[in-house]
């Protein structure tokens, strides 16, 4: 049983049921294009998809025009510093990362996908994110223990050409500044 503040009015069962009701979890992927005809399907995948593929191969910035990249954020954690719960592992952080993804969608209409990296080695986490970074318009680092979180953020800022937001650092700074 988790400790709750006086403003939390739910039971552990209600919290679990919320995450399990209907489809499990809090996020899903849906098409932004109509896929009702055979023509739609051939444009969405093969052979029609070859045209934007060729455009992006000639000009990588075209990915912002022909794919979801510009409105897609990766919410990434290794679960080493989950909220006030501590190091419970990558998989245990998934409900938090899904929760952050739905906040992006609900309040900014930004599509976000959770990625949990089952690794505590900062160099390996950096390499993993560098390898997938081009798929996203931004990276949101979440619930990664210090000092690794600072090392990871700094290295990614230096090597990726997309925004890197370290939620636990930047989010706290923004809220603190707003309060002042």
Regions found by a protein language model. Give the residues of each.
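N-terminal ligand-binding/catalytic initiation module
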Residues: 2-162
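A glycine-rich, Thr/Ser-enriched phosphate-binding loop motif common to dinucleotide/cofactor-binding enzymes
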Residues: 165-180
């Amino acid at each position: 049983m988790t400790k709750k503040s006086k403003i939390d009015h739910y039971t552990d069962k209600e919290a679990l049921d919320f995450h399990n009701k209907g489809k499990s979890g809090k996020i899903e992927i849906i098409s932004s294009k109509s896929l009702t005809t055979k023509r739609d399907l051939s444009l969405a995948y093969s052979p029609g998809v070859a045209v934007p593929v060729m455009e992006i191969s000639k000009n990588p910035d075209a990915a912002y025009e022909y794919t979801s990249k510009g409105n897609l954020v990766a919410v990434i954690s290794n679960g080493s510093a989950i909220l006030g719960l501590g190091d419970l592992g990558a998989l245990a952080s998934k409900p938090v990362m899904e929760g952050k993804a739905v906040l992006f969608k609900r309040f900014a209409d930004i599509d976000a996908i959770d990625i949990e990296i089952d690794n505590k080695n900062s160099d390996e986490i950096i390499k993993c994110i560098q390898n997938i970074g081009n798929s996203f318009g931004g990276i949101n680092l979440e619930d990664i223990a210090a000092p690794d979180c600072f090392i990871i953020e700094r290295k990614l800022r230096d090597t990726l050409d997309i925004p890197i937001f370290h939620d636990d650092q930047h989010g706290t700074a923004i809220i603190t500044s707003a309060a002042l």
